[in-house]
């Protein structure tokens, strides 16, 4: 059994178990948040309830101690996202992790066509996950195959889109809000949405705003968490 590192007495609540809401910054991985928390608290038993891609921001639920047993429960909750889809091009990763290609004219695309296209992506649908994803096929994560140029047959997966609302259109950019089931890839939704319009599309920004009843408005910034931990340690040291 891995030995728990020495930790500051004020970190006992984190050792026992906490549920912390973070607002993940742009370009941080979800595991970067875990590493930061482990470094600050010296608590090893830490996990998050649902990966956010590096180019996404927003709500990340992090659990410590006994609450790591509830991670699967949090992961199963419905999610809400806001973001933008850029029409008229595609990318291999379905987002801006790779360069846009297949540039297409939008001269025949109207706001009404964009609004009408949401109907086919609402309700229970079969969704093809991106090749650049952590899903495993025959024991190998898909992104390894994608990076090596290997062609892998992927099976579509059932997901549910409870709401798909277009909030603003300024072509080529379409702003949206989505409420969906766990397992939904918003990158795939963006790619499929562009394909349905016949012009291609990719996810150009994404923010997770809700997980179940948890909201990003209640989440903590990384700097605020660091200051909070420093204050806890300082208060305890003063009393000792």
Predicted features and spans:
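Catalytic/RNA-binding core of pseudouridine synthases
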Residues: 1-240
